[in-house]
């Protein structure tokens, strides 16, 4: 059992007492239902898609019982977004982390990825990558009707949502009567490498008096070149640059995401108010070709330029694939039981993550070279010999592999009823949830193979020079990497293998219950309650002691009480004040929690997982002042704070060797893996403006609008040695700004995104990504005619207009990675019927 501090405990007791009072007061049944408890329905934007969808988002935020930001369907459709990460990155305090230029993860208010929980139609799902981290590149925008980014967490939300809880709303078949259909078809180009971009989506629905269904599918694909340079640099005593290594890479990638799903629903007016079955499948696949040459200087010298330097040369070739998927099926109902509305559901979810990157490393050759790093993002390296003429005496196979399969069964029961509490109309909500998760896989690993002489790699050199934003002074050329992989497979030596000590096997059961009451006052409302979560987990694996395998297990049971309170006060009809106090937890991911380790008694080291890790615990506050000065308009300021204990990160720690081998009890060994730090926190302020010129300027200038937001954040935690570091994902400043014009069926928007530098990954807290910015443009025109009652529009999107280069920096302040991707353009047509 986890015991809370006295302050936390007193707050928990007081809130649970109030929730108990609410349950007792349930006998004082009130008649009718307050409209403030109604679910906000999707608003379908047509004539003014940007303005109308902005108004829907503002109204959803205004009527919420907690701090939340919303993106409506048409906002997603009109933004030039590839996936949900792009969409969420436009909200206040949310920042995108990219992979090869494309949005993948979300840092919610500067917090690590794991502090954000994702749900589909209110049913939370595990992260595909490691059981915790949500990846948003596998969820295309086209299947989504609404995004809800909850910033202050309520008891009916998972306790793991330390920073935020993102709910993806899919489409409701009863939002429109009869048959409907929506189609989107787009084609485009990636400027660097002239890669093709394609997208399509199709959605259809039908609803009658009792029955309805919706079905949808979506597919997006893009071919891209990533122009990459990596560095190993340091500085001498006088501050001059020393070049140890230069790494030139060109990636050819094809990324595709596919989704399909639907919902079958019945609506009644007796005991069964609603019964439904929903299903969703989404996947992301990244096909990657690597062409890489590494130049290691034999005797590094000081200076940004030098001549006739001896270098060893290595070549890396690869054709591999990353893929992750989520499939979820839910059967649920809304039932009336007296004064109660009871909502049971059962959900089956499976997530898969697989990586297989077979790399061929050729080494053992060298030459001399001149270099000039005057432009650090475009290093110039001139070789004395033609790169393609170099011969490599040895070739090694490095098949990198990683996998995780996670199956979850979830039982959920929610119940609510109207009551009178403190003489005021209130809504009492109670709930139970049981999650049974089974995760199996292995961590990222490889086994080196000597493949010298098995095949001639030079015959696969196409002679085609790299597509590059930089100057490619080495004369890099593309290899037929697919042919190389076929040749490797033909030798019978390409295997997807891993050691027993790399395995992940975790069984996790989480049992939760909550009680919550929302009381309506003349001045606003008060929502309060608590959630209790009990975690039972067991991790199995093998301990390798100098080559001898022993089966090991780790298990524990712990309980957390997570109270929260939310006050929403209407100072005026157009002015709202909010303040919330919340608590939460973040459990270790499955790689961190695995029991498997490698032990070397001779070296006194242990490497691997840590099943004794504690869950991270949080307590914090949110407050905001929101001025709704016109329809679809908002000016707000907010602040937030989270205290985090038991921060999980990678480090080396002294341990008693008897923990791993009783014969060595009392001897001190070094454990290298995952440990708990302390004294973590993140805090910040947010500002948000959304407005239009509709009431300020005459036609046609009344079509202009502006949205802008900014967040200023800081964070830190203390490691086991007493040093302080930023939490991964924290940018000191995040900005977003959009200017749009919308009149006469024409819509256009320019969007700017910026985030300051941030730590990533947590395995090296000294390494940071440099500041990043993006400028995107979108426009659409609604066609003024219709053949059969449909509404059609044509659109054009342009992304990364300023052709940005993204940089990463080592702990010594020198650059260690620079990559660019070029602009992209997409044109298409949307038809709604």
Each predicted region: which residue ranges?
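Transmembrane beta-barrel wall of Gram-negative outer-membrane proteins
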Residues: 192-295, 314, 318-340, 563-565, ...
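Extracytoplasmic beta-strand/coil segments of soluble accessory domains associated
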Residues: 85-124
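N-terminal periplasmic accessory domains that precede
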Residues: 84-87, 104-107, 119, 134-135, ...
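Short acidic/polar hinge/loop motifs at secondary-structure boundaries
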Residues: 123-151, 202
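N-terminal periplasmic "start-of-domain" segments of outer-membrane beta-barrel proteins
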Residues: 44-77, 105, 113, 123
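C-terminal beta-signal and adjacent terminal beta-strands/loops
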Residues: 645, 704, 756-760, 781-833
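Outer-membrane beta-barrel signature, preferentially recognizing the C-terminal barrel domain
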Residues: 309-328, 498-511, 556, 585-644, ...
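Gram-negative outer-membrane beta-barrel transporters
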Residues: 641-643, 654-655, 660-759, 805
């Amino acid at each position: 059992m986890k015991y809370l501090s006295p302050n936390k405990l007193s707050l928990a007791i007081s809130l649970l007492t109030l929730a108990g009072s609410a349950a007792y007061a349930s006998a004082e049944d009130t008649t009718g239902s307050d409209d403030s408890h109604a679910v906000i329905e999707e608003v379908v934007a047509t004539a003014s898609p940007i303005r109308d969808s902005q108004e829907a988002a503002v109204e959803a935020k205004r009527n919420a019982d907690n701090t939340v930001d919303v993106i409506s369907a048409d906002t997603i459709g009109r933004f030039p977004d590839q996936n949900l990460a792009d969409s969420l990155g436009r909200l206040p305090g949310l920042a995108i982390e990219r992979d090869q230029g494309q949005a993948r993860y979300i840092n919610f208010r500067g917090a690590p990825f794991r502090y954000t929980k994702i749900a589909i139609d209110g049913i939370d799902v595990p992260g595909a990558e490691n059981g915790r981290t949500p990846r948003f590149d596998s969820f295309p925008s086209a299947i989504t009707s609404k995004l809800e980014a909850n910033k202050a967490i309520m008891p009916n939300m998972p306790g793991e949502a330390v920073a935020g809880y993102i709910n993806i709303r899919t489409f409701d078949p009863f939002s429109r009567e009869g048959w409907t259909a929506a189609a989107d078809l787009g084609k485009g180009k990636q400027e660097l490498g002239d890669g093709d971009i394609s997208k399509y989506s199709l959605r259809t629905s039908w609803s009658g008096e009792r029955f309805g269904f919706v079905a949808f599918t979506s597919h997006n694909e893009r071919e891209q070149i990533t122009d990459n340079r990596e560095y190993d640099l340091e500085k001498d005593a006088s501050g001059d640059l020393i070049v140890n290594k230069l790494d030139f890479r060109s990636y050819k990638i094809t990324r595709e995401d596919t989704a399909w799903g639907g919902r079958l629903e019945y609506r009644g007016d007796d005991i069964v108010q609603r019964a439904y079955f929903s299903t969703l499948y989404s996947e992301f696949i990244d096909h990657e070709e690597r062409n890489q040459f590494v130049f290691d200087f034999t005797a590094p010298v000081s200076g940004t330029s030098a001549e006739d330097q001896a270098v060893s040369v290595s070549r890396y070739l690869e054709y591999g694939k990353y893929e992750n998927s989520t499939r979820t099926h839910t059967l649920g109902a809304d039932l009336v039981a007296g004064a109660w509305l009871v909502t049971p559901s059962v959900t089956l979810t499976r997530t898969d993550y697989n990586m297989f990157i077979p790399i061929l490393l050729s080494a053992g050759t060298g030459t001399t070279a001149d270099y000039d790093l005057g432009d650090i993002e475009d290093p110039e390296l001139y070789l004395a010999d033609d790169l393609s003429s170099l011969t490599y005496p040895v070739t090694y196979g490095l098949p990198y592999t990683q996998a995780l399969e996670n199956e979850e069964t979830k039982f959920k029961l929610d119940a609510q009823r109207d009551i009178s509490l403190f003489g005021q109309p209130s809504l009492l909500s109670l709930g139970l949830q049981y999650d049974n998760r089974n995760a199996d896989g292995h961590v990222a690993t490889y086994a080196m193979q000597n493949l010298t002489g098995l095949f001639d790699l030079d015959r696969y050199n196409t002679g085609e020079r790299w597509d590059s934003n930089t100057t490619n002074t080495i004369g890099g050329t593309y290899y037929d990497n697919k042919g190389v992989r076929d040749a490797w497979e033909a030798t019978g030596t390409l295997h997807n293998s891993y050691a027993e000590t790399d395995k992940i096997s975790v069984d996790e059961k989480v049992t939760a219950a909550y009680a919550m009451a929302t009381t309506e006052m003349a001045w606003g409302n008060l929502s309060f309650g608590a959630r209790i979560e009990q975690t039972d987990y067991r991790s199995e694996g093998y301990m390798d002691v100098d080559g001898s395998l022993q089966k090991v297990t780790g298990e524990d049971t712990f309980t957390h009480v997570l109270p929260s309170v939310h006050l929403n006060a209407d100072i005026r009809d157009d002015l709202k004040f909010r303040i919330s106090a919340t608590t939460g937890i973040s459990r270790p991911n499955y790689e961190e929690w695995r029991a498997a380790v490698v032990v070397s008694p001779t070296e006194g080291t242990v490497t691997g997982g840590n099943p004794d890790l504690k869950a991270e615990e949080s307590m914090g506050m949110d407050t905001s002042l929101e001025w709704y000065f016109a329809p679809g308009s908002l000016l707000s300021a907010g602040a937030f704070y989270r205290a985090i204990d038991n921060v999980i990160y990678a480090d080396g720690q002294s341990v008693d060797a008897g923990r791993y081998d009783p014969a060595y009890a009392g001897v001190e060994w070094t454990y290298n893996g995952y440990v708990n730090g302390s004294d973590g926190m993140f805090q910040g302020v947010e500002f948000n403006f959304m407005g239009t010129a509709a009431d300020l300027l005459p036609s046609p200038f009344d079509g202009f609008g502006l949205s802008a937001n900014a967040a200023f954040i800081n964070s830190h935690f203390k490691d086991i040695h007493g040093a302080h570091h930023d939490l991964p994902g924290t940018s000191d400043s995040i900005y977003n700004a959009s200017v749009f014009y919308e009149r006469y069926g024409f819509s256009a928007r320019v969007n700017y995104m910026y985030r300051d530098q941030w730590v990533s990954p947590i395995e090296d807290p000294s390494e940071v990504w440099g500041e990043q910015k993006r400028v995107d443009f979108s426009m659409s025109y609604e066609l003024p005619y219709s053949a059969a009652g449909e509404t059609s529009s044509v659109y054009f999107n342009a992304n990364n207009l300023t052709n940005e280069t993204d940089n990463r920096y080592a702990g010594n302040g020198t650059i260690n990675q620079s990559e660019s991707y070029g602009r992209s353009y997409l044109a298409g047509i949307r038809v709604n019927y």
